[in-house]
Amino acid sequence: MNKRGNNNKMIFKTPQHLGLLCSTFIFSFFFSTAIWAVPNASPASTDNLKVYLEQIIGPDDYRNYKNIQQLQRVSAWIKEQMHLFGIPCEYQNYAVNGLSYRNVVCRLTNGHADKVIVGAHYDVFGEQQGADDNASGVAGVIETARILVQQKSQLAQNIEFVFYTLQEAPFFKTEQMGSFIHAKSIQSQKDQIQGVYILEMIGYFDENLVQEYPAGLKWVYPQHGNFIAAVSNLQSYALGSQYCQSMRALDRLECQRFIAPAFVSGMEFSDHLNYWKFGIPAMMITDTGSFRNKHYHSKTDTLKTLNLAKMANVVDGLVYSLLTPIQP
């Protein structure tokens, strides 16, 4: 049990770029206080990201596979927040060991045949807040959606936002992962899927630490931990290339590309792996996770360790990339 306390009072916040609707919204018996963001066309906002992170992390129990009530709380909040942006969502329900789990699938459509998928997992490993892993990724997807809904007419494809359950152990690399369930469900549409962008830990940066890498890569890439990484296989080369080009165009945060097959350790450490299995191009946007973040899978993975300004840079790069036609 998290002992941070539970404040049931109505809370009001007013970020610079975005008005916030704050309400007491009851989801069954488990969700008593919620904060909502109202859509407004603007660059990624650190204030919004903080609100999302606080709501995802929550005040009480941890959102691991044993605490289904917490997983339901988070998925219900995500669905309602996206609804307030004008993006309809549905649950993708499935059972594991007789228990019910669900992805949240949200669609921003504008009449195109092709689509791009943007996703992140919302569960955690064990008993910890999981601020970087992976509340940061979920917050990034939500903020991306907020911006894109205001620029819908500029999109050259539909966008499907997916929030996955059961990415963490003991389900990682099994067919019970939420991303495996989703990837399998869309395999017949793969010719219409331009690519999948997975946000996996996007909030930890430290220019003073010595960055670690999978074997053989430390001589090629920077020693500092102050960049965002675009991880892809050869099939997904164009996705990673375009994302880093977008980051370079914005010129706010360094972007490094990693291109390798799934058998190279570290390249497969998230939900993009399941799309590769079905021949769907996919990439991971990440701060490199356990290769950088000393708080990985520990109780010290908290909100105060995140760099919200650089998270916002990561989101702006993704928005820029999604508004630019993918170059093969």
Task: Show the residue positions of the predicted features.
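Active-site-adjacent substrate-binding region
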Residues: 195, 206-328
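A non-catalytic alpha/beta surface segment that caps or lines the substrate-entry region
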Residues: 51-111, 258
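Extracytoplasmic/secreted proteins, especially bacterial periplasmic and envelope-associated proteins
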Residues: 48-55, 69, 73-84, 136, ...
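Second-shell loop/turn segments in exported
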Residues: 39-43, 60-69, 94, 125-134, ...
